[in-house]
Amino acid sequence: MTLKVDVKTPAGKTDGSVELPAELFDVEPNIALMHQVVTAQLAAKRQGTHSTKTRGEVSGGGKKPYRQKGSGRARQGSTRAPQFTGGGTVHGPKPRDYSQRTPKKMIAAALRGALSDRARNDRIHAVTELVEGQTPSTKSAKTFLGTLTENKKVLVVIGRTDEVGAKSVRNLPGVHVISPDQLNTYDVLNADDVVFSVEALNAYISANSKEGASV
């Protein structure tokens, strides 16, 4: 089975259609797999630079505050113990790497599932370009996207050389623009609709379909 979507122009006309291979856009989504991949992707974004000081790292506290016996108070060896104000932290966070190793096949399968979910709900769109001409226009791009979907969160996938399109949508709230080689599960699931330029869609299909890989 092969899905088809109409290719729209900024003028609002239909310029043919493009096929969405079933192997990429009509697979059964694996919810658990997509969750695992997205969790790993978000974990990898964490800086992990958080740090607290233990009682051995806090400045001061080298002298025993008072004698061991005879004061009537509990024995203390340092004013930098965790029960004191200004003392060290017990089991506090230290710098660490949160990234997880996720096999490439799992990442690719999760992306196929996410795209298939959007395709089944008619939330994948194809366009010739975002604006006509060689002059960026945020107003024109916003109007054009509004004709494609009423949803606010849109993922735009265009070629790396399409600077006019990138400049036209980069300041639009709720719109995230990436190139086809940057396509990932989180961005697809985080967006309500995915808008491909024909160039970007063909690039993704040729790079990931079995037919494209054999060419």
From Swiss-Prot:
Keyword Ribosomal protein set for record: yes
GO terms, biological process: translation
Superkingdom of origin organism: Bacteria
InterPro entries with a match to the protein in the record: Ribosomal_uL4, Ribosomal_uL4-like, Ribosomal_uL4_dom_sf
UniProt keywords, alphabetically: Ribonucleoprotein, Ribosomal protein, RNA-binding, rRNA-binding
Disordered, as annotated region: 43-100
One example GO MF annotation: rRNA binding
A GO-annotated cellular component: ribonucleoprotein complex
Complex formation: Part of the 50S ribosomal subunit.
Function: One of the primary rRNA binding proteins, this protein initially binds near the 5'-end of the 23S rRNA. It is important during the early stages of 50S assembly. It makes multiple contacts with different domains of the 23S rRNA in the assembled 50S subunit and ribosome. Forms part of the polypeptide exit tunnel.
Family recorded in the similarity comment: Belongs to the universal ribosomal protein uL4 family.
Name of this protein: Large ribosomal subunit protein uL4
Organism lineage: Bacteria, Bacillati, Actinomycetota, Actinomycetes, Mycobacteriales
